């Protein structure tokens, strides 16, 4: 399994200096996020803070949505009724042979294959 992808809540926790998120990120050499996560992080910030946040999250490799990811997201959405944006986030990790690290057990059940929930708040 290659280096993981991080869900929006873990990235936001890291930006907010939560020690649990920091500890999780230090475990891995490479930090990847879906373009959807990148968008969700920026969407949660006031316009005047976005450039600073964009620079900080540039430490993450951002993986763009392509046809394989879109097809996998459609399959996940159909099978699980997961919200479409969450399906895109999970599909990005799966198509790239990785796990998704999240603390969002509401939308990503911890027992679902390919999900790692290292902490909850």
Residue ranges and their predicted role:
Residues 10-11, 37, 69, 88-89, ...:
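Alpha-helix capping/helix-boundary segments
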Residues 28-30, 59-61, 94-99:
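Short active-site oxyanion
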């Amino acid at each position: 399994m290659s280096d993981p992808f991080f869900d929006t809540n873990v990235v936001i926790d890291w930006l907010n200096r939560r020690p649990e998120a920091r500890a999780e990120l230090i475990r891995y050499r490479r930090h990847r996020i879906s373009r959807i996560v990148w968008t969700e992080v920026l969407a949660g910030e006031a316009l005047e803070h976005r450039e600073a946040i964009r620079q900080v999250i540039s430490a993450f490799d951002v993986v763009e949505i392509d046809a394989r990811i879109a097809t996998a997201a459609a399959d996940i959405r159909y099978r699980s009724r997961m919200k479409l944006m969450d399906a895109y986030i999970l599909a990005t990790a799966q198509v790239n042979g990785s796990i998704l690290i999240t603390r969002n057990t509401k939308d990503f059940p911890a027992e679902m294959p390919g999900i790692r929930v290292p902490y909850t708040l």
